[in-house]
Amino acid sequence: MLSIPSLHLTRRCVLACGLAALLAACGTPADAPAMRLGQAESLQLRSWVPNGLRAQLQLMPVTGGQPTGRFWGAKISNSSLQEALEESLRDTGLYAPRPAEARYELRVNLVQLDQPMVAVLDAKVAVTLSYTVVESRGGRTVYERKLRTLHTTEFGSAMLDPNERMRMASEAAIRSNLNTLLRELLELKWPE
C-alpha cells in the first residue's frame, strides 16, 4: 500500500508527465531562417550566376502554404516560405533590388507537404514545390518545374518532441528544394 507522501509524489509525477506531453504537442511552425540556403551554399552559387540572371528575379507572392495548428503539427506558411526564398535569392545575387526593373518573375506554389501524423521515431517529410519563371514583359514561360525533395530527421535530434522533428525535417526538405531550384536556374542559358 502507498503511503500518503508517496501518493502525493506519484500525483506530482503524473501531473508533470501530463504537462510535458501537452507542451510537446504544441504546434511548431517552420522557421524562415532555417529554410533558407546556408552561407556556404549561397556563396558558392553566387559565383556561378550568369550576367543575364544577376539581380533579375522578382519574387511574386508565394501560394499554397498553411499556418501551423495551435496544438499539433509543423506546417509551412506562405510568409515564412516567402522570406526564405527572398533571402536565398538575395544571398545568391539573383534577387532584383528594384522589382519594376526585373527581367523575370518567379512564381512559387507549395503543392504538397507530406508529413506523418505523428513522428514516433524518425520524421520523414517530403515537400513538392512548383516553380515558374516568366518574362516580366511578354509573359513567356522560361522555366517551369515541380520539384519534390525528401528529408528525414532522426529521433535523436529531438527525442522529446515529435513536432520539433517534423519542423526540422520540413525545413531541411525546403532548403534542399531551394538548392535544387537555384542550381537548375544557373544551368540554363540566359540572354545578356
Annotate each PLM feature:
Residues L2-L7, C26-E83, L186-E192:
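A structural "domain/chain start" motif
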Residues P67-I76, G138-E184, P191:
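Short secondary-structure boundary motifs at beta->alpha junctions and helix caps
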Residues G27-L37, T92-E144, H151-E164:
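Surface-exposed short loop/turn segments
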Residues R11-L15, C26:
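N-terminal export leaders
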Residues A84-Y95, T180, E184-P191:
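Structured segments of extracytoplasmic/periplasmic soluble domains
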